[in-house]
């Protein structure tokens, strides 16, 4: 994506011929990410006719939706999943995160590059595909977005975990209801909220990669302040490329203000100590499962947390560590990846 609105969707050759490095410099999605440019409302409405009821016209005369309307955002996600990933049923409860799919997909495609460069499954360094690749999604949420994108883009198997029973039941229902997902994704409840890998990774398990989108706020108040800023930005940038918008489902329960298009249970949005505390716990616990995982990876939303995590991982004796930058319009984020074994071992 560019920071300016695009008037047409780029062709496959326009973006697939770019390198990931070029995409980052241009603020664009990964070249293999199908969610390039503006949303194709003709194709999306064909995949899910219900989207037409939520489609409006922006000041430029282009079709879009009201991203402050949680119902419209949910239907847009349903259309995207139906059109690009063949998912016929997808729904989440009120008040749970309705993730922006283009950005979530970028994580998976950059992870595919990491595996291509380090697993040596394919001699030409193309991303490995098929069920031989087993991925673990920590904190999958009710949406199960990473398992959906990863399994349908590359054919990988996924185990998806969460500490919230409603999220686990919802994600399991989505996977059980869609034949394409039923044999590809297994959803597990983490019975101990303070543990990450224990109870999920068994003695005989091996995962090629772990993915994680951790809660990054330290309190509900901090999360609500961030949401208010995002809502303000939604109003300021209305009419820009929709893929830069933050998709959130509204909440009607809990302690959050009901007039905010908030989205997300407390377990999804914040944890004690915030992002750095969660990442620290994840890194320390990863030591105990070094022989069971190829690459541990996680998103790091706050750039100031990168250096402390690098220092900690060095202290823990990791063999390899990588920072993978991602850029989506004017938003930048990164993946922190580490492992305890080298390519040769």
UniProtKB/Swiss-Prot annotation:
Polar residues: compositionally biased ranges: 1-14, 246-258
UniProt xrefs under Pfam families: Methyltransf_10
Chemical reaction(s) catalysed: adenosine(1618) in 23S rRNA + S-adenosyl-L-methionine = N(6)-methyladenosine(1618) in 23S rRNA + S-adenosyl-L-homocysteine + H(+)
Entry-linked Gene3D superfamilies: Vaccinia Virus protein VP39
Residue ranges the record marks as coiled coil: none
GO cellular component: cytoplasm
EC number: 2.1.1.181
Entry's Gene Ontology molecular function annotations: 23S rRNA (adenine(1618)-N(6))-methyltransferase activity; nucleic acid binding
Biased composition (Basic residues): 229-239
Main EC class the enzyme belongs to: transferase
Subcellular location: Cytoplasm
Domain of life: Bacteria
Biological process, per Gene Ontology: rRNA base methylation
Residue segments, region Disordered: 1-35, 225-258
Keywords assigned by UniProt, alphabetized: Cytoplasm, Methyltransferase, rRNA processing, S-adenosyl-L-methionine, Transferase
Purpose of the protein: Specifically methylates the adenine in position 1618 of 23S rRNA.
Entry similarity comment: Belongs to the methyltransferase superfamily. METTL16/RlmF family.
Protein name: Ribosomal RNA large subunit methyltransferase F
Species of the source: Psychrobacter arcticus (strain DSM 17307 / VKM B-2377 / 273-4)
